[in-house]
Amino acid sequence: MKDNFDRALAEILRHEGGYINDPHDPGGETNMGISKRSYPLEDIKNMTRERAAAIYRRDFWNAIRGDELPAGVDLAAFDAAVNSGPSRAAKWLQRAVAVKADGVVGPNTLAAVQKADPARTINRMLDDRLAWLHGLPTWERYRIGWSRRIGEVRAVGLDMVEAAQVPVEPVAAWWASAPPGAVEWLRRAPG
């Protein structure tokens, strides 16, 4: 969803943390989830939040077309793209909505996503993602963190779906259907 990048980024950064150089991490030196392996020309250790945000928007959010995905689905796809690559994230999204999994979020994928139940899409994507992570040789080392992350992304994503589906009654409609005397009472209320 167009207005969700900042919220989704905050969730990503909460999971990615700051600077680390874990010799067991295939990404090697990372900061805010941006790895030296993927960005060899970046000054990883001194990376700013603004620079990380620009990279995340350009290379991950835009790749999964986050602005065009429903609330919650955008977070699930974005987090998957950051953690496992945009192509793999796109394939999980595509399988969740039963379209050809070619790894590119295009018009067919977007049309299917718009027709699908967003909560079901999130759950299917994250179940598929967790199963894939379970098969990695690094699963035993990172399973607690990965499982926690997916559980938290699921919870936040489903909350975003619910919040987006709550109808907001226009004020004019409320005034028109207000109980007798309520409008006059509000007009006389102090303040």
Where are the language model's segments positioned?
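Cell-wall polysaccharide-cleaving catalytic domain and substrate-binding groove, primarily
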Residues: 1-191
